[in-house]
Protein backbone atom coordinates (compact mmCIF):
# COMPACT_ATOMS: atom_id res chain seq x y z
CA UNK A 1 0.00 0.00 0.00
CA UNK A 2 1.63 3.22 -1.15
CA UNK A 3 -0.44 6.13 0.20
CA UNK A 4 -2.05 6.08 3.65
CA UNK A 5 -4.20 8.93 4.89
CA UNK A 6 -3.40 9.67 8.52
CA UNK A 7 -6.57 9.51 10.59
CA UNK A 8 -5.94 7.12 13.47
CA UNK A 9 -2.85 7.73 15.57
CA UNK A 10 -1.29 5.94 18.51
CA UNK A 11 0.91 8.21 20.61
CA UNK A 12 2.94 7.53 23.73
CA UNK A 13 5.63 10.10 24.41
CA UNK A 14 7.58 10.97 27.54
CA UNK A 15 8.25 14.59 26.55
CA UNK A 16 4.81 15.76 25.44
CA UNK A 17 5.92 18.97 23.73
CA UNK A 18 7.57 17.01 20.89
CA UNK A 19 4.03 16.55 19.55
CA UNK A 20 3.42 20.29 19.14
CA UNK A 21 4.67 20.62 15.52
CA UNK A 22 2.40 17.76 14.46
CA UNK A 23 -0.61 18.95 16.44
CA UNK A 24 -0.26 22.34 14.79
CA UNK A 25 -0.94 20.97 11.30
CA UNK A 26 -3.45 18.16 11.77
CA UNK A 27 -7.17 18.55 11.11
CA UNK A 28 -8.86 18.18 14.50
CA UNK A 29 -12.08 17.03 12.90
CA UNK A 30 -10.60 14.11 10.98
CA UNK A 31 -7.91 12.78 13.32
CA UNK A 32 -8.33 10.56 16.37
CA UNK A 33 -5.68 9.71 18.94
CA UNK A 34 -5.22 6.66 21.14
CA UNK A 35 -2.40 6.21 23.60
CA UNK A 36 -1.11 6.36 27.14
CA UNK A 37 -3.02 8.41 29.69
CA UNK A 38 -0.57 11.28 30.06
CA UNK A 39 -0.18 11.72 26.31
CA UNK A 40 -3.94 11.65 25.77
CA UNK A 41 -4.47 14.34 28.39
CA UNK A 42 -2.01 16.49 26.47
CA UNK A 43 -3.63 16.07 23.05
CA UNK A 44 -7.09 16.70 24.52
CA UNK A 45 -5.89 20.03 25.91
CA UNK A 46 -4.82 20.84 22.34
CA UNK A 47 -8.37 20.18 21.13
CA UNK A 48 -8.05 16.68 19.70
CA UNK A 49 -10.08 13.55 20.30
CA UNK A 50 -8.07 11.18 22.46
CA UNK A 51 -8.73 7.86 24.19
CA UNK A 52 -6.47 6.45 26.87
CA UNK A 53 -5.65 2.85 26.02
CA UNK A 54 -4.48 0.82 28.97
CA UNK A 55 -3.95 -2.83 29.82
CA UNK A 56 -5.83 -4.71 32.49
CA UNK A 57 -2.48 -5.59 34.06
CA UNK A 58 -0.32 -2.58 34.81
CA UNK A 59 2.33 -3.88 37.26
CA UNK A 60 3.44 -0.40 38.34
CA UNK A 61 3.54 0.83 34.76
CA UNK A 62 5.71 -1.99 33.45
CA UNK A 63 3.14 -3.32 30.99
CA UNK A 64 0.75 -0.41 30.48
CA UNK A 65 1.23 -0.37 26.69
CA UNK A 66 1.95 -4.08 26.20
CA UNK A 67 -1.51 -5.09 25.07
CA UNK A 68 -2.46 -7.32 22.14
CA UNK A 69 -5.23 -4.93 21.04
CA UNK A 70 -2.68 -2.13 20.65
CA UNK A 71 -0.12 -4.27 18.85
CA UNK A 72 -2.72 -5.87 16.61
CA UNK A 73 -3.74 -2.44 15.34
CA UNK A 74 -0.08 -1.63 14.64
CA UNK A 75 0.89 -4.97 13.08
CA UNK A 76 -2.23 -5.74 11.05
CA UNK A 77 -1.79 -5.96 7.28
CA UNK A 78 -4.77 -3.96 6.05
CA UNK A 79 -4.51 -5.58 2.61
CA UNK A 80 -5.44 -8.97 4.12
CA UNK A 81 -9.11 -9.61 4.82
CA UNK A 82 -8.25 -12.09 7.58
CA UNK A 83 -6.36 -9.36 9.45
CA UNK A 84 -9.24 -6.89 9.10
CA UNK A 85 -11.72 -9.47 10.35
CA UNK A 86 -9.34 -10.38 13.16
CA UNK A 87 -9.28 -6.76 14.35
CA UNK A 88 -13.07 -6.63 14.35
CA UNK A 89 -13.23 -9.84 16.38
CA UNK A 90 -10.64 -8.59 18.82
CA UNK A 91 -12.49 -5.30 19.32
CA UNK A 92 -15.63 -7.09 20.45
CA UNK A 93 -13.91 -8.75 23.37
CA UNK A 94 -11.07 -6.44 24.37
CA UNK A 95 -11.42 -4.01 27.29
CA UNK A 96 -8.98 -1.40 26.16
CA UNK A 97 -10.12 2.16 26.76
CA UNK A 98 -9.88 3.91 30.08
CA UNK A 99 -13.05 5.80 30.97
CA UNK A 100 -12.87 7.36 34.41
CA UNK A 101 -11.71 4.60 36.71
CA UNK A 102 -13.15 1.77 34.67
CA UNK A 103 -12.19 -0.17 31.58
CA UNK A 104 -14.79 -0.32 28.86
CA UNK A 105 -14.90 -2.30 25.62
CA UNK A 106 -14.81 -0.34 22.37
CA UNK A 107 -16.66 -2.28 19.67
CA UNK A 108 -16.01 -0.97 16.19
CA UNK A 109 -13.69 1.85 17.23
CA UNK A 110 -10.66 -0.22 18.18
CA UNK A 111 -11.02 -2.46 15.12
CA UNK A 112 -9.46 0.30 13.02
CA UNK A 113 -5.73 -0.14 12.29
CA UNK A 114 -3.42 2.69 13.24
CA UNK A 115 -2.11 4.86 10.41
CA UNK A 116 0.65 6.42 12.48
CA UNK A 117 2.58 5.49 15.62
CA UNK A 118 4.45 8.14 17.59
CA UNK A 119 6.68 7.06 20.46
CA UNK A 120 9.01 9.10 22.61
CA UNK A 121 11.13 7.01 24.96
CA UNK A 122 12.20 8.17 28.39
CA UNK A 123 15.94 8.26 28.99
CA UNK A 124 17.40 5.27 30.83
CA UNK A 125 19.01 6.05 34.18
CA UNK A 126 22.19 4.08 34.83
CA UNK A 127 21.72 4.41 38.59
CA UNK A 128 18.30 2.80 38.31
CA UNK A 129 19.07 0.27 35.59
CA UNK A 130 17.57 -2.03 34.36
CA UNK A 131 14.40 -0.74 36.06
CA UNK A 132 14.68 2.42 33.94
CA UNK A 133 14.49 0.51 30.64
CA UNK A 134 11.59 1.61 28.43
CA UNK A 135 10.20 -1.77 27.41
CA UNK A 136 6.78 -0.80 26.08
CA UNK A 137 8.03 2.11 24.00
CA UNK A 138 10.74 0.08 22.30
CA UNK A 139 8.28 -2.72 21.59
CA UNK A 140 5.88 -0.26 19.97
CA UNK A 141 8.65 1.13 17.77
CA UNK A 142 9.77 -2.33 16.69
CA UNK A 143 6.20 -3.31 15.82
CA UNK A 144 5.81 -0.24 13.60
CA UNK A 145 9.20 -0.91 12.00
CA UNK A 146 8.10 -4.41 11.05
CA UNK A 147 4.84 -3.18 9.51
CA UNK A 148 6.08 -0.02 7.78
CA UNK A 149 4.12 -0.93 4.66
CA UNK A 150 0.92 -0.34 6.61
CA UNK A 151 1.79 2.21 9.30
CA UNK A 152 3.98 5.30 9.59
CA UNK A 153 6.32 5.89 12.51
CA UNK A 154 7.95 8.78 14.34
CA UNK A 155 10.27 8.11 17.27
CA UNK A 156 12.01 11.37 18.24
CA UNK A 157 11.82 15.12 17.68
CA UNK A 158 13.73 15.00 14.39
CA UNK A 159 11.58 12.23 12.91
CA UNK A 160 8.44 14.12 13.96
CA UNK A 161 9.78 17.19 12.14
CA UNK A 162 10.33 15.07 9.02
CA UNK A 163 6.84 13.63 9.40
CA UNK A 164 5.30 17.10 9.56
CA UNK A 165 7.13 18.18 6.40
CA UNK A 166 6.04 15.01 4.63
CA UNK A 167 2.39 15.36 5.63
CA UNK A 168 2.34 18.99 4.53
CA UNK A 169 3.76 18.01 1.14
CA UNK A 170 1.34 15.11 0.64
CA UNK A 171 -2.04 16.37 1.84
CA UNK A 172 -1.93 14.50 5.13
CA UNK A 173 -0.83 11.20 3.61
CA UNK A 174 2.30 9.13 4.07
CA UNK A 175 4.02 7.47 1.13
CA UNK A 176 5.62 4.03 1.22
CA UNK A 177 9.17 5.25 0.62
CA UNK A 178 8.87 7.74 3.48
CA UNK A 179 7.56 5.08 5.83
CA UNK A 180 10.43 2.80 4.86
CA UNK A 181 13.00 5.53 5.54
CA UNK A 182 11.45 6.29 8.92
CA UNK A 183 11.50 2.59 9.79
CA UNK A 184 15.17 2.36 8.87
CA UNK A 185 15.95 5.38 11.02
CA UNK A 186 14.01 3.87 13.90
CA UNK A 187 15.89 0.58 13.59
CA UNK A 188 19.19 2.45 13.89
CA UNK A 189 17.81 4.41 16.84
CA UNK A 190 16.80 1.22 18.65
CA UNK A 191 20.18 -0.36 17.89
CA UNK A 192 21.99 2.58 19.52
CA UNK A 193 19.64 2.47 22.47
CA UNK A 194 20.24 -1.25 22.96
CA UNK A 195 24.01 -0.79 22.74
CA UNK A 196 23.84 1.94 25.39
CA UNK A 197 21.77 -0.27 27.67
CA UNK A 198 24.25 -3.10 27.22
CA UNK A 199 27.02 -0.78 28.43
CA UNK A 200 25.04 -0.05 31.59
CA UNK A 201 25.67 -3.60 32.73
CA UNK A 202 29.43 -2.93 32.79
Predicted segments — roles?
Residues 112, 116-127, 135-175:
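A short, charged helix-loop
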Residues 41-93, 102, 109-128, 135:
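Acidic/Gly/His-enriched mid-domain segments of enzyme catalytic cores or analogous surface patches
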Residues 4-8, 28-31, 46-49, 68-71, ...:
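Short coil/turn connectors at secondary-structure junctions
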Residues 1-52, 56:
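N-terminal glycine-/serine-/threonine-rich phosphate-binding loop
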Residues 98, 102-104:
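Intrinsically disordered, low-complexity polyampholyte segments enriched for Lys and acidic residues
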Residues 11, 32-37, 51-55, 76, ...:
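General beta-strand structural signal in soluble alpha/beta enzymes
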Residues 165-168, 172-202:
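Long, charged alpha-helical interface segments
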Amino acid sequence: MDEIKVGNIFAAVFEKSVLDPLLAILDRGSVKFWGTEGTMKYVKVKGYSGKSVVTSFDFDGRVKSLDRAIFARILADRTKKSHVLGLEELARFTPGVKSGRNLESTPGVSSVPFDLVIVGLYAPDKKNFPESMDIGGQALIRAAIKNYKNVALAFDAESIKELVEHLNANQGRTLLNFRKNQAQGAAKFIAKRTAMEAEFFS
